Amino acid sequence: MAGASFYSPLPCPFLRNFPFIMSSLHLARLLALAAIFIWASLAALGVKLAHLPPFLLVGLTLAVAGIASLPTRRSWRVPARTFALGTGGLFGYHFFLFLAFRNAPAIEANLINYLWPLLIVLLSPFLFPGLRLGLPHIMAGFAGFVGAALVVSKGRLAFEADYLLGYLAAVLAAFLWAGYSLATRKLPPFPTAAVGGFCLASGALSLLCHVLLEPLVIPAWGDVLWVLLLGLGPMGGAFFLWDLAMKLGDQREIGLLSFLTPLLSTLLLVVSGGGRLDQWTLLGGGLILGAALVGALAPPSRQTA
């Protein structure tokens, strides 16, 4: 309908009691920032479990997220296409990301992986005609990516043809996560609780990859607490917040906010004693904050048809 808002009203009347949550856009912004802050803790928490093989770690943490959400399992009954896309998005992203880390230097692979926020910004208008991609969004998107590149690479990059397979895997990971994120709103409506089913299925597939591709390892009892924290936080709970944010908000703005992830992750490592603050982090952080500010100040789009 002409002139109708592209965004939905608040999903719960109770939320109207909070004056700082005035619309679904405000709620989506808060949910996205919460997910981003939780994801930023992944590196600091992951250091505690660096001795575990990657697929084992992902499998265990996603399984924790799925098991924790079993009380909502009735909401997991979604169309097969939705379940396949949700599971494929979560599992496929981590599979190709680890394939990239195995076949390319970590800095370059991680940098390519951070194309996903830019892809969300650039692809949103093609999937959602009610969203317009203006020059400020494009410039902010590339500024955010450059900022993320500076934070991740510390000014040191060396792309070599020998690592082409790893680079391609990182590109696929970025496209998979951007595609999964955008599809949560493009698919027929499904409850956010269904993400628990996606996590459990993805965790099972990751554990299968551990059995087939990695040396078998039995975690120690001292690992249990950290696995639970990861599964309830950056490798679980954050996915639920992200799903709801993408359904309610402006995908362009959320994409720009996502560039905060590597910056916040670095700052948390600095605070926890696992990293140091340098000029690259400060310069990249300035670009990322500028990009996020553009996204937050840009006027919301309206559907024209």
Feature-to-residue mapping (PLM):
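Hydrophobic alpha-helical transmembrane segments of multi-pass integral membrane proteins
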Residues: 27-31, 53-70, 84, 137-146, ...
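Hydrophobic transmembrane alpha-helices of multi-pass small-molecule transport proteins
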Residues: 64-65, 69, 122-123, 133-155, ...
